[in-house]
Amino acid sequence: VVLDSALRTGARINARYAADPKALIGSATETADNTFDLFVAIPAPSASSAGSAPGSAALSGPYWAVTLEFPGGVTANARNTQFSLSPAAAGRLADFSVMGHAANIAQGLPQTQQMTGATYTLNADGTGTASFGTAAATQLISGSKNLYVSADGNVVIGGSVTTGSHDFLIAVKAVSGVTNATWNNKFWGAGLRVDPNAVTGYSGSMAAGGAAKVYWTKREKAMGAGVFDFTGINGYSLNADGSGTMELTQVGLGAGGKAFVGSAINRSDTAAYEIFFGVQLPALSGSGVFLSPLGVVNAASSAPPGNPISPGQFITLYGTGLAKSTQTAAPPYPATLNGVTVLVNNKQAPLYFVSPGQINALVPYTTQGTTATIVVQNGSVNSNTVTVPLAATAPGVYSLDQSGSGPGAILHADFGLVNAGRPAAPGETVLIYLTGMGAVAPAVADGTAGGSNPLNKSVADVVVLVAGQPATLLYNGLAPGFPGLYQINVTLPTLLSGGGNLPLAIQTNNAYHDQVDIPIR
């Protein structure tokens, strides 16, 4: 969803809509100015559902709440918190402990603050206020906040309207009996982050598989870096009450596991201040030949919806009724396979694999623009049209287990597999296999393999990082003999301490991909 900003003329919000719980979230990631934002909207309750008295059912906690504040509009006063918000008696909030940090308190180290005597009011339309005592720069949270409760009571948003205040509060109704496996769905996500390197607003999606790690796709707008696409993985650990950690952030899972909030509170990240919010993706289905609007993904990384496609990239399409049966093609890949054709911006895409629920195709090299339309033709029947972002590159490294994470598809120089049984050594040359590196020179025909003399090199510049250290680039282009498969040869950094599975990231001018590891001895 693209929305015109109500606050800035000409700014457009890169937004996402969720149906359960209902919310509209996003950030103005495509604007060229130096304004960075987070947008959250929720449906207001009717008078009959909200009630008119404090303590009504519209605010029935507990809730996991996070805040991001910039008192006076300056980062020197920045503060980030997480706490449990729960109504007690009419008009009173239960006493609670605030976890957080502030730039002007203890050098930004995490602190706790005991909150007693907090009160609230709630009106029939879901609006209200919460008072956390007299406003004070020495407190993690204080003063009065306006509150807005969603129609179903699952989400609360708010902030202060006092002159000079710049803050955001987001809360989700807490759940109980949580384990790591509870976080098992796909979500829209958006956030705002301030750290010494940049100010960043982002909008995207996240997939949690219940196995203590989540996959992120983010379109980010960062000060000094412009707009770029991030795909990566974060580990997490949840407590029984839904609170927990995700890498260097604190999170709270709520709304029956269908929404989450987060804030940057960690001793290892004391200069970062961030707030983010996620809501479950809607369930989409259709009749006949149906291509899921959420089902166009990078064939290597399987990054969540919203990640761009790029010219020459292997993509996977998910839906129903896409083909009458399963069939696989041999190179050069044809434009029609088993009666199925895929059109990308009205141009036929080479097909490797078709089945009723999945298609693997190559994006034509001539695909241009900022978005692309995709249509599946099964015989004489066309699917719905799906529009997806398009970028010069959208790197995704293949993984050994085909999940998009864990040990990557990486070979030693003798073409032996890099794995736990035969890890790579610091300073060794390795071969990395991926897709999504965009245009090559000399060009090749759609669906055909790259050659060996001459090699078809990627036009895009690339940096390979191992545990954050740059590797020495030797080759970046198509893997000879395999359509749509790219290969990057690097010499690993010589100073890789610790060994084990180290993160391997791919950085281009418009993208940063960080989902796989490389075993190092």
Identify the meaning behind each predicted range:
Residues 1-292:
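Mature soluble binding/inhibitory domains
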Residues 62-66, 70-80, 84, 105-106, ...:
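A sequence-level detector for low-complexity, Ser/Thr- and acidic-rich stretches
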